[in-house]
């Protein structure tokens, strides 16, 4: 029996065969659909695979990117390899050649050829070696010179007066121009030591200077506390002399056998001041030799009360005919200004700058008279040099009160002097060849031109060093290069840029004086001794000198640019110590070797600070 139909509906029997058939049909349809799907997927897969095989080679396989772990960051392996490769290439292209070049032996590039001023300077310094008196050092390179004057001053002068320099073509030692020459050489060394070093003349120059200052220390009792005299010259003579002396005889220094008198003076304020200036200036040069510098300073200061004393205010040449005939001094107050400035720079003692700026000193010297003859620097006129030297103080340190008023006047006077040197103001005549006639057409023009060229060139360097582009000549502003051009034009004339195309410096250029008025250069170096008058035949011959006195600057041409190369014409053909000192100073100021600047500081090494130093802070307070 069957139970009742709880769900409702018919309780009739189901056709089992029909149900089975329907189920079979459903399963068959499902199976066919699955096979189609599978077949479709397989067809698509086959097409993709074919695409892989048929695609270009660089696209047919895509690899997964790889990375390199650098610790702090991960980068693509490709980027990493590119970076490393680039660094390697950069090393090969840049670093490796540098390493190779640095590992090779170094060859310094050749320096530029020296200019004419340098070449002439080498020559000009040799003149001083040819003028040395006394027992010569072994390294003296002038083959035709030997020991001479080894008994000068003996036995009358304690220690003698051996050494120093002969002045020109004679065998006289004039202390006044010799001291001035040493002062000028020191000045050029202080301002341009780097240039002397650049051309390898620094040690030579100092040897030349020391030979002179060693001798000047013998010309007075430098160990005394109070001086009563100073020696003014050794040897001498007059042009009309008829007894054996340095003028009457024509002998080389090594053969001298006549008496050589020593002249002295108890009232030679000008000479005392000049020697003081020379020693003070040299002490600045030799600061690296403290003992010698101290000795020079002591000598310079010992002379100060001597030349300041009113009882000694006479010129050294007064009453001395053999001095008056050649180096007659005409003033002394210009030397006072000159010495005062150098003493101050050497010692820092304000007493000296106060003296140099005392109004009565420049007024007595006529420093502000604006007279052309007082604008010409020389062994006899220190005004232009002294005022430029103190203008330096104002330009670089500007000390102010109480010196400013007088320093300003010195500065203005220096500017006026420089204006007077310029052609457009027609203060001094010029030859048709361009040589300025500072000595008003008188003989020996080159010495004055050389000193003026140095001062002009130096003043331009002072202004350039302070950043001042020029100065005023009245209402007209003049640039510094105009002064340099002036100095160059005058020195170029001396070196051969003149109507005769002739160098007036022996040994420089192809054409130069061959018959220089000079005893030592005139007589053959054959070890034969000539008597007092025997040498006259060498003076009077028309043949060139057997010995070239290399570097000697002769007196020069006349106002018509004419020069006669004759020994007897001593005004034209004789060199002098002070002339060559001016030439050396001008040449070193103009040469481009070592640069164009000056040494601003060495001059002031001993000058004290202008203002009181800041006091130290108080000690820390403690209860």
Curated annotation (Swiss-Prot):
Its main location: membrane. It comes from the Eukaryota. The keyword Transmembrane helix applies. The active site is at residues 517, 565, 574. This is Endoglucanase 7. The chain crosses the membrane at residues 80-100. It is a single-pass type II membrane protein. GO terms for molecular function: cellulase activity. Keywords: Carbohydrate metabolism, Cell wall biogenesis/degradation, Cellulose degradation, Glycoprotein, Glycosidase, Hydrolase, Membrane, Polysaccharide degradation, Signal-anchor, Transmembrane, Transmembrane helix. Glycans are attached at residues 116, 221, 328, 349, 412, 429, 464, 548, 571. It comes from Arabidopsis thaliana (Mouse-ear cress). Its EC number is 3.2.1.4.
């Amino acid at each position: 029996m069957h139970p009742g139909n709880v769900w409702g509906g018919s309780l009739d029997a189901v056709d089992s065969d029909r149900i089975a058939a329907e189920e079979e049909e459903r399963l068959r349809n499902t199976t066919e659909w699955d096979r189609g799907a599978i077949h479709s997927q397989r067809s698509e897969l086959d097409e993709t695979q074919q695409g892989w095989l048929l695609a270009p080679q660089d696209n047919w396989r895509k690899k997964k990117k790889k990375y390199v772990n650098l610790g702090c960051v991960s980068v693509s392996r490709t980027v990493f390899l590119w970076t490393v490769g680039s660094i390697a290439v950069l090393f090969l292209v840049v670093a490796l050649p540098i390493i190779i070049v640095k590992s090779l032996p170094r060859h310094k590039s050749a320096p530029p050829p020296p200019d004419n001023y340098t070449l002439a300077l080498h020559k000009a310094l040799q003149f001083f070696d040819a003028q040395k008196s006394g027992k010569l050092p072994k390294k003296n390179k002038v083959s035709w010179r030997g020991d001479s004057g080894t008994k000068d001053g003996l036995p009358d002068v304690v220690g003698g007066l051996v050494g120093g320099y002969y002045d020109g073509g004679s065998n006289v030692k004039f202390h006044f121009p010799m001291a001035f020459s040493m002062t000028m050489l020191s000045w050029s060394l202080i301002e341009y030591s780097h240039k002397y070093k650049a051309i390898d003349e620094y040690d030579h120059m100092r040897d030349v200077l020391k030979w002179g200052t060693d001798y000047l220390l013998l010309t007075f009792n430098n160990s005394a506390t109070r001086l009563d005299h100073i020696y003014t010259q050794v040897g001498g003579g007059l042009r009309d002399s008829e007894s054996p002396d340095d003028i009457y005889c024509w002998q080389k220094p090594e053969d001298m056998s006549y008496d050589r008198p020593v002249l002295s003076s108890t009232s030679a304020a000008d000479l005392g001041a000049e020697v003081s200036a020379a020693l003070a200036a040299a002490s600045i040069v030799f600061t690296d030799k403290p003992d010698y510098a101290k000795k020079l300073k002591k000598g310079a200061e010992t002379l100060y009360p001597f030349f300041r004393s009113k009882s000694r205010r006479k010129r050294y040449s007064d009453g001395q005919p053999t001095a008056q005939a050649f180096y007659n001094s005409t003033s002394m107050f210009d030397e006072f200004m000159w010495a005062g400035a150098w003493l101050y720079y050497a010692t820092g003692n304000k007493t000296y700058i106060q003296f140099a700026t005392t109004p009565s000193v420049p007024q007595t010297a006529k420093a502000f008279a604006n007279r052309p003859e007082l604008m010409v620097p020389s062994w006899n006129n220190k005004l232009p040099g002294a005022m430029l030297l103190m203008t330096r103080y104002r330009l670089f340190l500007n000390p102010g009160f109480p010196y400013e008023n007088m320093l300003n006047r010195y500065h203005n006077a220096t500017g006026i002097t420089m204006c007077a040197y310029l052609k457009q103001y027609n203060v001094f005549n010029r030859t048709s060849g361009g040589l300025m006639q500072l000595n008003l057409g008188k003989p020996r023009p080159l010495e004055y031109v050389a000193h003026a060229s140095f001062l002009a060139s130096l003043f331009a360097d002072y202004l350039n060093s302070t950043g001042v582009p020029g100065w005023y000549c009245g209402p007209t502003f003049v640039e510094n290069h105009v002064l340099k051009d002036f100095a160059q034009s005058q020195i170029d004339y001396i070196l051969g840029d003149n109507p005769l195309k002739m160098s007036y410096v022996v040994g420089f250029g192809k054409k130069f004086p061959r018959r220089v008025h000079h005893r030592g250069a005139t007589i053959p170096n054959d070890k034969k001794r000539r008597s007092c008058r025997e040498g006259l035949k060498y003076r009077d011959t028309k043949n060139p000198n057997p010995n070239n006195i290399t570097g000697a600057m002769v007196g020069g041409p006349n106002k018509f640019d004419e020069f006669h190369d004759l020994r007897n014409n001593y005004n034209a053909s004789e060199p002098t110590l002070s002339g060559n000192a001016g030439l050396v100073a001008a040449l070193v100021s103009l040469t481009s070797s070592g640069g164009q600047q000056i040494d601003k500081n060495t001059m002031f090494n001993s000058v004290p600070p202008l203002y009181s130093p800041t006091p130290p802070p108080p000690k820390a307070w403690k209860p």
